[in-house]
Regions:
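N-terminal binding-site loop/beta-alpha segment at the start of enzyme catalytic domains
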Residues: 1-81, 132, 265, 281-282
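CE4/NodB-like, metal-dependent polysaccharide N-deacetylase domain
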Residues: 22, 96-116, 135-139, 160-161
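Acidic-and-aromatic substrate-binding clefts and catalytic sites of carbohydrate-active enzymes
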Residues: 35-38, 58-66, 88-95, 121-124, ...
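Short, acidic/polar
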Residues: 36-47, 92-106, 155, 178
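A structural motif
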Residues: 52, 108-111, 142, 166
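A short, structured active-site edge motif that brings together acidic residues
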Residues: 78-91, 112-119, 149, 173
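Beta/alpha (TIM)-barrel catalytic core signal, keyed to glycine-rich beta->alpha loops juxtaposed to Asp/Glu
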Residues: 119-283
């Protein structure tokens, strides 16, 4: 696969809209969903050693304290790490206090990216939450604000009622769930697409014969093949593991490129089915 990846060689994408001008997000991030707080020190610490410079946590994950401990280490340059956290559904009407609590756990004065975790449409207060997020950005407390799991009608409503779209939308995305209509809306409006559950492990994507065959062709693992697919679609992609070897493996996706027929084969895997909750009903 060629030269080993370093953090300096990881590509970045520009965040627009509700962002500090010129803010860049590394295209590969390290997610800590389902990582116990006590395990974050080792996993995130190892990720930093390997070269990750983008960490994704959330209040509901229960491990912001662990992320904060690592960020506070003397050998970690806070300005060198892009930090994301999220507001949970029960705090849509309490965003400033929720933000303060997260910042206290993270030990930060300024956050890079704050996200609404789910639209929770039955509550019907996500526009209020978005307005509060924009206020935090205007106050200089967060460099960029965005959302997770918003569908086109949710995004359109934010635009109609506030005039400002998110800089990024973090969504469930994989070759088995390609969300073409939503990604087209993102592209049209300058919203960065960020993928969670990018490997669709629960759906068996890594054992799919097409993925296995293409991985063998490029002499990479099925996971590396799929993560590379995300990068070539200009997505930000979140990896997740507590296993040192797997953390390293997931980072080594920049030493090869997919061919047009590879992309065509992967495009044909779309099933349109989710492994996670439905954003139109969850929350």
């Amino acid at each position: 696969m060629g030269v080993m990846t370093t953090h300096e060689s990881v590509p970045t994408l520009s965040l627009g809209h509700a962002s500090t001008p010129g803010l860049e997000i590394p295209q590969i991030g390290f997610g800590v969903w389902e990582v116990p707080d006590t395990d974050v020190d080792a996993a995130f610490g190892r990720a930093l050693e390997i070269g990750y410079r983008h960490i994704d946590t959330a209040r509901i994950y229960g491990n912001e304290d662990g992320v904060g401990r690592v960020l506070g280490r003397e050998d970690v340059d806070r300005d060198d790490v892009f930090v994301t956290t999220k507001v949970w559904n029960d705090d849509h009407t309490n965003v400033p206090a929720a933000f303060d609590a997260s910042m206290g756990r993270l030990g930060l004065e300024v956050l890079d990216l704050y996200l609404i975790h789910w639209p929770a449409p039955e509550q019907d207060v996500y526009v209020d939450a978005w307005t509060a997020m924009l206020d935090l950005q205007r106050q200089g407390r967060v460099r960029s604000v965005g959302v997770c799991n918003f569908q086109v009608p949710h995004l359109q409503r934010l635009l109609d009622e506030t005039g400002v779209l998110p800089s990024i939308n973090q969504i469930e995305l994989s070759p088995y769930l390609q969300q073409r209509e939503l990604r087209a809306f993102h592209a049209e409006h300058g919203i960065v697409t960020e993928a969670w559950s990018p490997l669709a492990v629960r759906a068996g994507l890594l054992d799919d014969p097409v993925v296995v065959e293409l991985a063998a062709k490029h002499e990479v693992t099925p996971a590396q093949l799929v993560l590379r697919w995300h990068v070539e679609l200009d997505n930000v992609v979140l990896t997740r593991s507590v296993t040192p070897a797997r953390i390293a493996e997931n980072f080594e996706i920049f030493g090869f490129a997919l061919e047009d027929d590879d992309l065509e084969a992967l495009a044909g895997l779309d099933r349109g089915t989710r492994t996670g909750p439905d954003p139109d009903t969850f929350g």
